[in-house]
From Swiss-Prot:
Keywords: Amino-acid biosynthesis, Aromatic amino acid biosynthesis, FAD, Flavoprotein, FMN, Lyase, NADP. GO terms for biological process: amino acid biosynthetic process; aromatic amino acid family biosynthetic process; chorismate biosynthetic process. Reduced FMN (FMNH(2)). The lineage of its organism: Bacteria, Pseudomonadati, Pseudomonadota, Gammaproteobacteria, Enterobacterales. This is Chorismate synthase. NADP(+) binds at residues 48, 54. One of its GO terms (molecular function) is FMN binding. InterPro entries: Chorismate_synth (IPR000453), Chorismate_synth_AroC_sf (IPR035904), Chorismate_synthase_CS (IPR020541). It comes from Escherichia coli (strain 55989 / EAEC).
Length: 361
């Protein structure tokens, strides 16, 4: 199975399945001498882990990360960092009824078409459980970016169903179970989630992630444009069906005179481009959005077939998120951090001696 690695100089390779013994990853390219402990990684893992609120899956995994290699006496050595998280709350019996049935909207059908077999227990490798290791690896990148470059990466929920959320207060994001930055909409989200749980249904969501303090010059045209790599990273997250950079699809309705980010001696006057021009960071905030589909793991009966081609009706049992977008916030932050870390190392490798007299803001 290919496709388990992302990055060129900062490389993250993950392994493991939803109901296997453990999840793990190898992180290559971390510079030596960076203070690093398991506690540095645990904060973001706790933000992502299941069972932390009544609105997410009640699978209770502590997600305690272990550093197996690459750190000596509290600092990175420059060698591969091995990370491991044990699975402790699997209930594989919940999935015995779907051993021969393809859940509609899931990867069951496509995995079996590709490999000739599948791990039906919680989706196996296709499960969002895999993203725990992305968050752990991303926490390393976030620490390096913050301490060495002053880069801050933040994410939040900006829409659930037909409820749009304004970014009014970043400090509020960590104070409610929805990662919601809009104090006026929390009650509406709560009401929607309670209704969905009662109906046994689910809902889609939009997540926004923002990086501040990113220097100008990151990105490798033409095929490794910074926005292309960000889109690739975010699209690789489970349930993501669309990614926008900056104003995204809204630019369709704009004229060139409206969309261009004009520049004065005081800097850029707008940021429709989301901080990236020509595939290279401009020094402005990098802004990306991603749309997540409603999970298909619901108790509303649906039609499908089994592996023998027979039509059946099924209800998905188990412990699932009514809105997968909620726990996707720290995952999006991690993936953006991984991409920025990789591009910073690539920029330093090729263009460390480049100096310009062009203004920077």
């Amino acid at each position: 199975m290919a496709g388990n690695t992302i990055g060129q100089l900062f490389r993250v390779t993950t392994f493991g399945e939803s109901h296997g013994l453990a999840l793990g990853c190898i992180v290559d390219g971390v510079p030596p001498g960076i203070p690093l402990t398991e506690a540095d990684l645990q904060h973001d893992l706790d933000r992502r882990r299941p069972g932390t609120s009544r609105y997410t899956t009640q699978r209770r995994e502590p997600d305690q990360v272990k550093i197996l290699s690459g750190v000596f006496e509290g600092v990175t050595t420059g060698t591969s960092i091995g990370l491991l998280i044990e699975n402790t709350d699997q209930r594989s019996q919940d999935y015995s009824a779907i051993k021969d049935v393809f859940r509609p909207g899931h990867a069951d059908y496509t995995y079996e078409q590709k490999y000739g077999l599948r791990d039906y227990r919680g989706g196996g490798r296709s499960s969002a459980r895999e993203t725990a290791m992305r968050v752990a690896a991303g926490a390393i990148a976030k620490k390096y970016l913050a301490e060495k470059f002053g880069i801050e990466i933040r994410g939040c929920l900006t829409q659930m169903g037909d409820i749009p959320l304004e970014i009014k207060d970043w400090s509020l994001v960590e104070q409610n179970p929805f990662f919601c930055p809009d104090p006026d909409k929390i009650d509406a989200l709560d009401e929607l989630m309670r209704a969905l749980k009662k109906e046994g249904d689910s809902i889609g969501a939009k997540v926004t992630v923002v990086a501040s303090g990113v220097p100008a010059g990151l990105g490798e045209p033409v095929f490794d444009r910074l926005d292309a790599d960000i889109a690739h990273a975010l699209m690789s997250i489970n349930a993501v069906k669309g990614v926008e950079i900056g104003d995204g699809f809204d630019v369709v309705a704009l004229r060139g005179s409206q969309n261009r980010d004009e520049i004065t001696k005081d800097g850029f006057q707008s940021n429709h481009a989301g901080g990236i021009l020509g595939g290279i960071s401009s020094g402005q905030q990098i802004i990306a959005h991603m749309a997540l589909k409603p999970t298909s793991s619901i108790t509303v009966p649906g039609r499908t077939i089994n592996r023998f081609g027979e039509e059946v009706e099924m209800i998905t049992k188990g412990r699932h998120d009514p809105c997968v977008g909620i726990r996707a916030v720290p995952i999006a932050e991690a993936m953006l951090a991984i991409v920025l870390m990789d591009h910073l190392l690539r920029q330093r490798a090729q263009n460390a001696d480049v100096k310009t007299d062009i203004p920077r803001w």
